[in-house]
Design a protein with these regions (language model features):
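Accessory, non-ATPase domains that flank or precede helicase/AAA+ motor cores in DNA-metabolism machines
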Residues: 1-377, 384, 389-405, 444-445, ...
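Inter-lobe coupling/hinge segments of SF2-like helicase ATPases
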Residues: 213-227, 236-678, 686-690, 694-696, ...
């Protein structure tokens, strides 16, 4: 929505340059986020708002106290919406934020923050809470020479302070066994003064980064991109920028130079990344280039670390904030630059609770704060590309890799002609072709590394009976159970159900159960069995739990692994200079999805994973195994022809009226009662197709691609329109319809600009 004509926030549409636009950052920061382009049934938004408040540093069990007997008259500029808070506290006394929310349903962090700063309320943590910053006691030698004669150990402390200056009590306690009582005695005697300072928890877990010795020289393309963006910064010509750079072209260095510029102007920067897996490497590069004034915000932090980061950002001691999509709501004043790296990535879309697209919200936030927003990608979304072509966005291109490194060569291997490599007795055929297996051997023998990509975790996607042909199904979802070799367990990747592998077929009693297909576990096992001398690692959601993610990435980066098998977690943004071979085991996988974005997703995914090869001194090679080597998307990937692919895809979208040439909303309905769901779907279609209803094209209702999840049946209706307004009007009808179903089990939600049809 923001990509196009502006996003409706707090019930009003706002465009860049709107005089009232300065209210938007507050609305975004408090994450009350009343976005018209998000329709949910009661409860979804409520839960999301509470979660957002908790994530931003306000605990739901914090106690709120009214200060000085205020009666609810919010003076000093407090907004009128804050009055009910003071009134509730005056009537009911101190209460937790969760209790207050029940009395003031629209409670947001911004309201409480405003009242706290005005001194009208006081926020106190519950007993035993450890969310605030730790403190350290600093000791400093005074200029006085008191009459008090210090003892031997006290003399050591005084001498140390005279020699080293202000020092930590923790340090002196470790060196000399200094006790608090001795500190108080010296302070009373006048030998020293003390002060407490906050000690922030380290989100980098002690990982040290060496500062850059010198900056790399910019290529002509990088220098031109930096110059173009900075010339427009802070002028009437300022607009969002699309930085379209091939993999390895140095987009990160462009970000560094832009950040330095806005920091020199006294403003701050926000960088959004699609995956927390990218954060450690990316922050390492930024810390080396920019210093330590960097905060990170993502779900991988502990609650205490997240709170410390939030408090430092709020106090203004942090110049650069890096994080996943939720970092968009960090309390950053004086915002000068927003970078959305890998802007095409679908994980920037929040699909639960308050639905929003972080890229689009970043564009709106930049317009409201006067910041420059840069959207970076090697494979831009067609929406962003279309905006650049129409002049709404500026376009800066990096067409070549840095240091003259060549792009990797890409080879399409036709699986119809290429025999599979030898497998084991249970599964004689493997998804690895003989050609790819030979390439792995040659690459490792040359002292180089390999990435094998398969976007399917587990050992096998199904287990079937050799006699009756039935596969093991989830009892709560209409999907096959995935076989996980570790623990010999069948697991549903949608609801989390798991069960041991049965000894016999539940349908016919046969003991001829065999796993079919392959996931990353099986590929890892096959490589280990085939190449006993190779060091093999795996990176997927199962192996990445806890510290597994960073341990695997660090081991691969240090060349403690020869081959890394992984899902799409290995495709995004990683820089492994010694990787020269990438093997894609199933190049057709995302083409099979029932989604009009299937071709775009395939091009992006394959180009991104191919970009991991040849980023160092040696050229890279990519082998993509496919059953459809003639497919135009795969040919475009092979040829590195983004422009040709985009042109063909945009022509197709234009003929069909799909985004970016039209607008779409996906209405999802679900219920445990299939009959009630069918009736609700028919009623909603009838409502939307009445002559008096907004003029939108209604497709459905139809079963969702996965018709049942968590014991709830699912159906969906696709709404399409050439204009935003009718779509918003139709969404309002859906919301009213959902309200009428409150007493039933049918749940309804509307996803504007849905990124997935699943």
């Amino acid at each position: 929505a923001i990509h196009d004509q502006g996003l409706r926030i707090d019930g009003r549409r706002t465009n860049a340059g709107d005089d009232g636009g300065q209210r938007i950052p507050a609305a975004i920061h408090d994450q009350g986020l009343r976005i018209d382009d998000r329709r949910t049934t009661a409860g979804d938004g409520e839960h999301a708002t509470l979660t957002a408040i908790h994530d931003q540093g306000l605990r739901i069990d914090d106690r709120l106290h009214l200060v000085g007997g205020q009666t609810g008259e919010a003076g000093g500029g407090a907004s009128g919406s804050a009055h009910p808070i003071c009134a509730a506290l005056a009537e009911h006394g101190a209460m937790t934020t969760d209790e207050l929310r029940k009395l003031v349903p629209d409670l947001t962090l911004m309201m409480l923050d405003e009242l706290e700063q005005l001194g009208m309320i006081r926020v106190a943590e519950p007993d035993g809470a450890s969310g605030g910053p730790k403190t350290d006691l600093l000791l400093c030698r005074t200029d006085a020479t008191p009459d008090h004669r210090p003892g031997e150990r006290q003399r050591l402390i005084i001498d140390f302070l005279e020699q080293h200056g202000e020092s930590s009590w923790d340090e002196l306690r470790e060196l000399y066994g200094l006790q608090r009582g001795q500190v108080r005695a010296l302070e009373r005697a006048g030998w020293l003064t003390t002060r407490e300072v906050p000690v922030w928890r380290d989100p980098f877990r002690g990982q040290r980064v060496e500062p850059r010795a010198e900056d790399p020289a910019l290529t002509d393309e990088q220098a031109a991109a930096v110059g173009e963006i900075l010339r427009a910064h802070g002028t009437p010509a300022q607009r969002p920028w699309l930085l379209h750079g091939v993999t390895g072209s140095g987009k990160t260095e462009v970000y560094v130079r832009l950040i330095r510029h806005v920091r020199a102007l006294g403003r701050r920067a926000l960088i959004l990344l699609p995956e927390i897996a990218l954060t450690p490497q990316f922050t390492g590069v930024m810390r080396a280039a920019l210093g330590e004034e960097i905060a990170v915000m993502h779900s991988g932090l502990t609650p205490a670390e997240r709170r410390d980061q939030w408090l430092q950002i709020r106090r203004g001691s942090i110049g650069v904030v890096i994080g996943a999509r939720s970092a968009l709501f960090a309390p950053i004043d004086d915002l000068g630059l927003i970078v959305v790296d890998e802007e095409h990535d679908p994980s920037f879309k929040q699909n639960e609770g308050v639905r929003y697209h972080a890229r689009d919200a970043a564009v709106m936030l930049a317009a409201a704060t006067g910041a420059t927003v840069v959207l970076g990608s090697a494979t831009p979304s067609l929406e962003s590309l279309n905006n650049a072509r129409r002049g709404r966005y500026g376009l800066a291109r990096l067409a070549r890799r840095v240091q003259g490194r060549p792009m990797p060569t890409i080879e399409l291997v036709d699986l119809r002609d290429q025999p599979p490599a030898r497998g084991d007795r249970e599964q004689p055929d493997t998804p690895i072709s003989v050609l790819l297996e030979q390439a792995v051997r040659q690459t490792v023998d040359a002292g180089e590394q390999v990435i094998l990509f398969l976007n399917r975790r587990g050992y096998a996607p199904a287990m079937a009976c050799g006699d009756c042909g039935e596969s093991l199904q989830c009892t709560a979802c209409e999907v096959s159970l995935t076989y996980h070799h570790r623990g010999r367990v069948m697991r549903c990747h949608y609801c989390g159900f798991s069960a041991p592998v049965p000894r016999t077929c539940p349908t016919c009693g046969s003991d001829e159960l065999t796993s079919t297909g392959a996931g990353t576990e099986r590929i890892e096992e096959h490589v280990v069995q085939t190449f006993a001398d190779l060091r093999v690692g795996r990176l997927d959601r199962d192996s990445a739990r806890g510290q597994g993610l960073q341990q695997t990435l660090q081991a691969f980066r240090r060349h403690e692994l020869d081959v890394l098998v992984g899902t799409q977690m290995v495709t995004k943004g990683h820089d492994f200079p010694n990787v020269t071979l990438v093997g894609v085991l199933d190049g057709d996988q995302s083409l099979r999805f029932p989604d009009f974005r299937g071709g775009e997703r395939t091009y992006q995914l394959l180009t991104q994973v191919a970009g991991r090869a040849g980023r160092g001194d040696r050229p890279g090679h990519v082998i993509i195994q496919t059953w459809k080597p003639e497919h135009h998307v795969l040919r475009a990937v092979r040829d590195g022809d983004f422009d040709g692919f985009a042109e063909a895809e945009l022509r197709l979208r234009s003929r069909q009226g799909y985004p970016p040439f039209g607008f779409a909303a996906l209405v999802r309905l679900n219920s445990a009662d299939q009959v009630a769901l069918t009736q609700a779907g028919a009623q909603l279609r009838e409502l939307l197709t009445r002559p008096t209803s907004p003029r939108v094209h209604v497709l459905g209702p139809t079963d969702a691609p996965i018709p049942r999840v968590r014991e709830r049946y699912r159906t969906q209706i696709l709404l399409r329109s050439s204009e935003r307004t009718p779509l918003h009007q139709a969404a309002a009808l859906v919301t009213a319809f959902a309200e009428s179903l409150r007493a039933t089990d049918v749940r309804v939600s509307t996803d504007i600009d849905a990124q997935s049809m699943l």
